[in-house]
Amino acid sequence: MAYEPDVMRRALARLEHRRDRAERRRFELERALYAQEPRLRQVDADLRGTMAELAELAAGGKPVAADGPEIAAIRTRNQALQKERTKLLAGLGYGPDALDDIPACPKCGDRGWTEDGQMCTCLRKLCTQEQIRALTALLNLTDEQDFDHLRLDVYSDAPWQGQSRSPREQMRRVVQVCEGFARQFPSYPLKNLLLSGGTGLGKTFLSGCIAREVSRQGYSVVYDTAISLFAAFETRRFTRDAEESRQARDETRRFLSCDLLILDDLGSELTTPLAQTTLYEVVNGRLQSGRHTIISTNLSMEHIAQRYTPQLASRIGGLYRELTFYGDDLRLVHV
């Protein structure tokens, strides 16, 4: 699971802020308790001293038996100090671990990664929140723009020329597939979708619903336009600037490695040889790695076959489920 670099940076920054805030609270409490009970400060200093003595013995060069008199004496003093410390804290109304550095997440110690190098659930949760926030801002989504609030009555129930179903019945079928894809991600039988149809028919709205639902489940989602994708790959290939090259690598990597890529407005770009190669690299690479993709376009599958290479058209036509949108432009009908 690979989140966008900006999403990861914001999540890690929140984790660092959480650690800093906890440390400030611990320090302020420690200062207050030391002021109330000066003996507590001395006990803590003496406890640190016993640990320093043990370290000095270990580094002394001569063998020291674990049950020898030196170790036993230090251990006895340490235990006596701990008992006194517990009693002092209790007298102030606190438990024995009140001043300990206890992380909010015991799995990773509030670092975001477990000892075996895996992303911790606490960091994944923060990434999910940041990803939803970014998608909401990008798509200008409101709280009611999801599958639970989607309305089919805005689509005409009258027959549509050249189609066997009315726009409303067609959208009912389209929504059924999109909702199943999102709610059952990544195990839904259909792995890749092609949302095809004119402007103002709900492709972007449904894409946003899918992005939000898949994000809520903790998967990484990248939503971007075809033009942005091609620009990133072009920069990666031609730039000579080191910083631009690094940023371009991050950009192109996110298109290839995210759990779900939603590519909007395919067909709006200039169809150059580089664009053809780039699109095939992304589509084929994601198919080979088993990652899921949704392509939104004004082009029909027939027009895609005319505009792009046979190899690319074959991959999309054979391994994507085309969902056709038709009807009146809702932006004009409901002004």
Model-assigned labels for residue ranges:
Residues L190-L206:
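Walker A/P-loop nucleotide-binding motif
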Residues P159-V174, S215-S257:
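Short glycine-rich substrate-engagement loop in P-loop NTPases that contacts/grips substrate
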Residues M1-A13, R18-R48:
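Short, charge/polar-rich alpha-helical segments
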Residues K191, Y219-S220, S257-L260, S289-I295:
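Loop/turn-to-beta-strand initiation segments
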